Amino acid sequence: MNYSLPRSLSLALVLLLGLAGCAKKDATPSPSVPPTTTVTPPVDPHLTYLKLLADGTTNQALPLQKAIDSCSAAGGGTLVLRKGTYMIGPIYMKSSVTLRLDTLATLLASPNMPDFTVNGKVVNLINGPGGAIHDVTLTGAGTIDGNGAPWWAAFQANSALVRPRLIYITSCQNLTVSGLTLTNSPSFHLVPSQCQNVVISKLKIIAPSNSPNTDGIDPANCNQVSITNCTIDTGDDCIAIKSGRVNGALVDACQNLTVTGCTFLHGHGLSIGSETSSGVKNLTVSNCTFTGTTNGIRIKSEPGLGGLIQNVNYSNISMTGVTNPLVINMAYALNPNNSYPADIPSVSGMTIDHLTVTGAKNAGSLVGLTTLPIQNLTLSNLTISAQTGLVMQNATGVVMSNWVINVTSGKSIITQNVQGTGF
């Protein structure tokens, strides 16, 4: 069978061929234009963008929890929340799950306080599941907001009120928390408890200076913890390293920790304690700045809550406008826990090197127990400007070198029951 093209289509083909022929005969060829290549990024099968309702008022805990559970059950991956405010109640992280909050993505705690009572107990905003887990990450440039104001007000009216933490992860191997802004927790902001290999970096932790018990980062009975380049501005301890008993039993010490490159604004400084019954050892703090905090370097504990604190080292520390730059207080609450009379706090092997302090109220107060003095304390390269001097009591093996303590009233150093050299 013979086919013929319609006349209009035949004319169009002739015209196109003619134009092509003209282009070939052009004496001045057009410059060569490189072809445009469109690259389609590979699809990451482990990356899931969640489509939750971002109206800031509808509780999204259930769909978020389902996504976490499914992701972990499938072998793990990354769940991403894009720009928006996602209101949630308590959620539980699972193994091999990364939760990423992109810029302007906010997880906002439900304002409904009963949402945080489960089976008669107060639970936290972001929890571990209660058993051992591994490879959990919270990251991104977004915000986790604890919506703490109603809790703070309720606590002022009832100091026995138990309040949620913002993030409380227990028994996790390989925990990473990075990049986020954590703010307005009802109580502590970030608590890794009995975790192994914890990496915390580039966090901003912010709460009003008068918000009660809003600690920044509180590692408890953890091993291998790195805290780097964080800015913490809260109403209580910026960092508090703890090692209390767990269900009444002594457990592993909180050990092998580094804190470096951090900035502390307001709050109560960098503390060890007050719970130290299981011990704290091998802490290195370096290149940190304190501005306007109540305390700088602080160790606080008491009989009934105490244990051995050993091999703790601080270097290259700068403080401005800090009320109490150096504090060791082994009778912190003056309220001994008679349940564990053998849990006596002690400090052995502490060094502070290259410390610069300006505008302090007190140079410091380093006071051990009369029955168990501070042992082996080395202070070197100190430059301190304060209203009153450095008080040391109940300490042995104190070595001081290359120090300048300028005070406006009294002696630079006041000692009682102290043995050592250089002061």
Where are these regions (language model features)?
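Bacterial Sec-dependent N-terminal signal peptides
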Residues: 1-33
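Extracellular/periplasmic carbohydrate-active domains that bind, remodel
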Residues: 22-423
